Amino acid sequence: MKQVKAYAKVETIEGIGSAERLHPLQRAFMTYASVQCGFCSPGFIMSAKGLLMRNPDPTREEVREWFTRHGNVCRCTGYKPIVDAVMEAAAVMRGEKAMEDITFTPPEDGRLYGSDFPKPTALSRVLGTCDFGADISGKMPEGTLHLAVVLAKREHARIRALDTAEA
C-alpha cells in the first residue's frame, strides 16, 4: 500500500456495505458470478469503487484497463463476469437501474440447478468476512484433527501396510 497521509480516510470492503444493505458493487459481484474462490473479490470491488468515483460511466475497456493498471488479478473468472458486474453496478449508481434489477430472482418453477443462483458463500466473500487458509485454522477448537496429504511415489502399487504410529 502506498504511503497514506496522516488522518486520511481509508475505506475497506468491510465498510462499504452490510448483509442487510449491500453496496451495488457487492450485489452485482454476487449476481453476475464474479465471486468464485473469492480471494480477489475485495480488491476488485474496492478498485472498482475507486474507478466509479472517478468515472461513473466507464466503457468495458476502461474497466479492464483500470484493473490492469492497479494490479487486480483473478485466476478463476476469466474477467468477463467481473467487468459485467462493474458495468451493472455503475448503472445502479447512476440511477439508470434499481438494485432489484441486479438482484438474482429464482426461476418461477423454483428450479435452482442450471440457474445463475449465487454461490452460498458469495455473501461472505463480498463482505470481506470469509476466512482463508490460516484464518480458518486459528478458529478451530483445540484438539481438532488435521489432514496431511501424502502423494504416492508410484502410479500403481499394492499397499501392503500403513504405519499410523505418528498419526
Feature-to-residue mapping (PLM):
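Signature of N-terminal electron-transfer/Fe-S-associated modules in redox systems
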Residues: 1-105
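Cofactor-binding beta-sheet edge motifs in enzyme active sites
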Residues: 38, 68, 72, 79-85, ...
